């Protein structure tokens, strides 16, 4: 029996985001009904905050390649996590013969966002989301440190964005990992043009990931 149209729509949305430059994995294992609404709300907050931060960067860095048409799109989670695989509904995974496109046939067969017996699969999905956000958090903090060296003070870290990332990380941190507080070690750079360009690239990538996460949480919340 093929999966429902609703599940196929979720899969199509996630795969589309994947090919636009999106999705990887993160943690979660507590009962779905207890946390799905909170995570859904936090994912919506993250998406709106990323949108605001990106728009602000595009306006302030008007002479930099910062728009969607100009930026060199890059996925920092590539080959490290895969949230699409981790969060695939079980009914799709168990009915791979029903998947019409070769583009979807690679998706792992274990993940699930459906209600009921989903604790293990939900843990895998939320783990993937956590790892995604951790990478973006560290990159944002590293860039923020470099922006402090800008004598013009053109643009600084977005505290609201960092807070939104942190809150969602805490909500999906089912493995009780210690949330990193320091940027990843990196050689200092005096090339502020490159740093600001990298900020634009990172914000575009994070927005795509936030859309993916929000759709996953919407599915969980309505299951």
UniProtKB/Swiss-Prot annotation:
GO terms for biological process: immune response. The keyword RNA-binding does not apply. GO terms for cellular component: extracellular space. Residues 1-23 form the signal peptide. The keyword Repressor does not apply. Keywords: Cytokine, Disulfide bond, Glycoprotein, Growth factor, Secreted, Signal. Disulfide bonds join 66-200, 87-125. InterPro entries: 4_helix_cytokine-like_core (IPR009079), IL-12 (IPR050676), IL-12_alpha (IPR004281). Glycans are attached at residues 41, 79, 121, 176. One of its GO terms (molecular function) is interleukin-12 receptor binding. Heterodimer with IL12B; disulfide-linked. This heterodimer is known as interleukin IL-12. Heterodimer with EBI3/IL27B; not disulfide-linked. This heterodimer is known as interleukin IL-35. Interacts with NBR1; this interaction promotes IL-12 secretion. Heterodimerizes with IL12B to form the IL-12 cytokine or with EBI3/IL27B to form the IL-35 cytokine. IL-12 is primarily produced by professional antigen-presenting cells (APCs) such as B-cells and dendritic cells (DCs) as well as macrophages and granulocytes and regulates T-cell and natural killer-cell responses, induces the production of interferon-gamma (IFN-gamma), favors the differentiation of T-helper 1 (Th1) cells and is an important link between innate resistance and adaptive immunity. Belongs to the IL-6 superfamily. This is Interleukin-12 subunit alpha. It comes from Marmota monax (Woodchuck).
């Amino acid at each position: 029996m093929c999966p429902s149209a609703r599940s196929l729509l979720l899969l199509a949305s996630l795969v589309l985001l994947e090919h636009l430059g999106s999705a990887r994995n993160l943690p979660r294992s507590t009962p779905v009904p207890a946390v799905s609404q909170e995570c859904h709300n936090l994912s919506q907050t993250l998406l709106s905050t990323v949108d605001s931060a990106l728009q602000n960067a595009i306006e302030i860095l008007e002479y930099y390649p910062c728009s969607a048409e100009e930026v060199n799109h890059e996925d920092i989670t590539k080959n490290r996590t895969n949230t699409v695989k981790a969060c695939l509904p079980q009914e799709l995974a168990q009915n791979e013969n029903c998947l019409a496109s070769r583009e979807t046939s690679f998706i792992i067969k274990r993940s699930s966002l459906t209600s009921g017996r989903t604790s293990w699969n939900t843990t895998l999905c939320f783990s993937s989301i956590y790892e995604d956000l951790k990478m973006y958090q560290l990159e944002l903090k590293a860039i923020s440190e470099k922006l402090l060296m800008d004598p013009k003070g053109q643009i600084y870290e977005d505290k609201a964005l960092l807070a939104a990332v942190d809150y969602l990380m805490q909500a999906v941190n089912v493995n009780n990992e210690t949330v990193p507080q320091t940027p990843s070690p990196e050689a200092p750079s005096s090339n502020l043009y490159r740093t600001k360009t990298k900020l634009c690239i990172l914000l575009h990538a994070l927005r795509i990931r936030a859309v993916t996460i929000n759709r996953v949480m919407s599915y969980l919340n309505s299951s």
